Amino acid sequence: MATFHFDLVSPEKLAFSGEVDQVDVPGIEGDFGVLANHAPVVAVIRPGILTVITGGNQQKIVVLGGIAEVSEKGLTVLADVATSVADLDAAMFAQTVSSMESALAGKQGSELDRAIERLDHYKNIQHQLTATAMH
Protein backbone atom coordinates (compact mmCIF):
# COMPACT_ATOMS: atom_id res chain seq x y z
CA MET A 1 0.00 0.00 0.00
CA ALA A 2 1.26 3.48 -0.88
CA THR A 3 2.10 5.72 2.05
CA PHE A 4 1.85 9.48 2.58
CA HIS A 5 3.14 11.99 5.12
CA PHE A 6 0.96 12.83 8.13
CA ASP A 7 1.51 15.54 10.76
CA LEU A 8 -0.71 15.94 13.82
CA VAL A 9 0.00 19.22 15.59
CA SER A 10 -1.54 20.57 18.80
CA PRO A 11 -0.63 23.78 20.65
CA GLU A 12 1.41 21.73 23.15
CA LYS A 13 3.38 19.50 20.78
CA LEU A 14 3.89 17.73 17.49
CA ALA A 15 1.79 14.69 18.42
CA PHE A 16 2.65 12.62 15.33
CA SER A 17 4.82 12.99 12.25
CA GLY A 18 5.61 10.24 9.78
CA GLU A 19 4.68 8.10 6.80
CA VAL A 20 1.34 6.29 7.16
CA ASP A 21 -0.96 4.02 5.15
CA GLN A 22 -4.27 5.60 6.19
CA VAL A 23 -5.74 8.12 8.62
CA ASP A 24 -9.42 8.12 9.64
CA VAL A 25 -10.49 11.62 10.67
CA PRO A 26 -13.61 12.61 12.68
CA GLY A 27 -14.97 15.36 10.43
CA ILE A 28 -17.70 17.76 11.48
CA GLU A 29 -19.67 16.76 8.35
CA GLY A 30 -18.88 13.07 8.79
CA ASP A 31 -15.83 10.91 9.34
CA PHE A 32 -13.49 10.45 6.39
CA GLY A 33 -10.51 8.28 5.54
CA VAL A 34 -7.37 9.61 3.87
CA LEU A 35 -5.15 7.43 1.70
CA ALA A 36 -2.16 8.31 -0.50
CA ASN A 37 -3.08 10.59 -3.44
CA HIS A 38 -6.30 11.78 -1.78
CA ALA A 39 -7.94 14.79 -3.43
CA PRO A 40 -7.05 18.12 -1.79
CA VAL A 41 -9.52 19.15 0.91
CA VAL A 42 -9.76 21.32 4.01
CA ALA A 43 -12.21 20.15 6.68
CA VAL A 44 -13.21 21.08 10.21
CA ILE A 45 -12.79 18.19 12.63
CA ARG A 46 -15.05 17.48 15.58
CA PRO A 47 -14.11 16.01 18.94
CA GLY A 48 -13.55 12.32 18.29
CA ILE A 49 -11.01 9.56 17.82
CA LEU A 50 -8.53 9.88 14.96
CA THR A 51 -7.09 6.54 13.80
CA VAL A 52 -3.62 6.27 12.24
CA ILE A 53 -2.88 3.04 10.34
CA THR A 54 0.70 2.09 9.54
CA GLY A 55 1.83 -1.37 8.46
CA GLY A 56 -1.35 -2.98 9.78
CA ASN A 57 -0.99 -1.35 13.22
CA GLN A 58 -3.55 1.16 14.51
CA GLN A 59 -2.87 4.09 16.79
CA LYS A 60 -5.90 5.88 18.20
CA ILE A 61 -5.67 9.53 19.21
CA VAL A 62 -8.38 11.62 20.86
CA VAL A 63 -8.71 15.01 19.16
CA LEU A 64 -10.97 17.74 20.50
CA GLY A 65 -11.62 19.73 17.36
CA GLY A 66 -9.43 21.46 14.81
CA ILE A 67 -8.71 21.60 11.07
CA ALA A 68 -7.54 18.92 8.62
CA GLU A 69 -5.82 19.78 5.33
CA VAL A 70 -5.05 17.25 2.61
CA SER A 71 -2.60 18.48 -0.04
CA GLU A 72 -0.03 17.02 -2.43
CA LYS A 73 2.36 17.01 0.57
CA GLY A 74 0.07 14.74 2.63
CA LEU A 75 -2.29 15.32 5.56
CA THR A 76 -1.85 17.93 8.28
CA VAL A 77 -4.21 18.08 11.25
CA LEU A 78 -4.09 21.11 13.53
CA ALA A 79 -5.92 19.89 16.62
CA ASP A 80 -7.09 21.92 19.60
CA VAL A 81 -6.03 18.97 21.79
CA ALA A 82 -4.45 15.65 20.76
CA THR A 83 -3.90 12.83 23.27
CA SER A 84 -3.10 9.21 22.53
CA VAL A 85 -5.81 6.89 23.83
CA ALA A 86 -3.04 5.00 25.64
CA ASP A 87 -2.10 8.19 27.54
CA LEU A 88 -5.65 9.36 28.27
CA ASP A 89 -6.77 9.51 31.89
CA ALA A 90 -10.23 7.90 31.58
CA ALA A 91 -11.32 9.05 35.05
CA MET A 92 -10.38 12.66 34.27
CA PHE A 93 -12.21 12.45 30.93
CA ALA A 94 -15.32 11.08 32.70
CA GLN A 95 -15.10 13.97 35.18
CA THR A 96 -14.95 16.44 32.27
CA VAL A 97 -18.11 14.88 30.78
CA SER A 98 -19.85 15.13 34.16
CA SER A 99 -18.85 18.80 34.52
CA MET A 100 -20.15 19.52 31.02
CA GLU A 101 -23.49 17.92 31.94
CA SER A 102 -23.74 20.06 35.08
CA ALA A 103 -22.93 23.23 33.12
CA LEU A 104 -25.90 22.72 30.77
CA ALA A 105 -28.30 24.13 33.39
CA GLY A 106 -26.78 27.60 33.06
CA LYS A 107 -27.07 27.79 29.28
CA GLN A 108 -29.90 28.66 26.92
CA GLY A 109 -30.66 29.21 23.24
CA SER A 110 -27.86 28.66 20.72
CA GLU A 111 -25.28 28.47 23.53
CA LEU A 112 -27.21 25.50 24.96
CA ASP A 113 -27.42 23.89 21.51
CA ARG A 114 -23.64 24.15 21.02
CA ALA A 115 -22.97 22.82 24.54
CA ILE A 116 -25.26 19.82 23.95
CA GLU A 117 -23.58 19.08 20.61
CA ARG A 118 -20.10 19.22 22.18
CA LEU A 119 -21.27 17.06 25.10
CA ASP A 120 -22.64 14.49 22.63
CA HIS A 121 -19.22 14.33 20.92
CA TYR A 122 -17.48 13.84 24.28
CA LYS A 123 -19.94 11.11 25.30
CA ASN A 124 -19.33 9.37 21.97
CA ILE A 125 -15.58 9.42 22.66
CA GLN A 126 -16.20 8.08 26.17
CA HIS A 127 -18.38 5.28 24.74
CA GLN A 128 -15.70 4.35 22.18
CA LEU A 129 -13.04 4.31 24.89
CA THR A 130 -15.18 2.03 27.06
CA ALA A 131 -15.95 -0.29 24.14
CA THR A 132 -12.24 -0.44 23.21
CA ALA A 133 -11.25 -1.27 26.80
CA MET A 134 -13.67 -4.21 26.84
CA HIS A 135 -12.06 -5.85 23.80
Curated annotation (Swiss-Prot):
GO MF terms, alphabetically ordered: ATP binding; proton-transporting ATP synthase activity, rotational mechanism
Transmembrane segments: none
Primary site of residence: membrane
Bilayer topology term: Peripheral membrane protein
Cellular compartments annotated: Cell inner membrane
One annotated Gene Ontology cellular component of this protein: proton-transporting ATP synthase complex
Keywords: ATP synthesis, Cell inner membrane, Cell membrane, CF(1), Hydrogen ion transport, Ion transport, Membrane, Transport
Name of one Pfam family that matches: ATP-synt_DE_N
Keyword Transmembrane helix: no
Similarity comment: Belongs to the ATPase epsilon chain family.
Assembly with partners or alone: F-type ATPases have 2 components, CF(1) - the catalytic core - and CF(0) - the membrane proton channel. CF(1) has five subunits: alpha(3), beta(3), gamma(1), delta(1), epsilon(1). CF(0) has three main subunits: a, b and c.
Role summary: Produces ATP from ADP in the presence of a proton gradient across the membrane.
Protein name: ATP synthase epsilon chain
Species assigned in the record: Rhodopseudomonas palustris (strain BisA53)
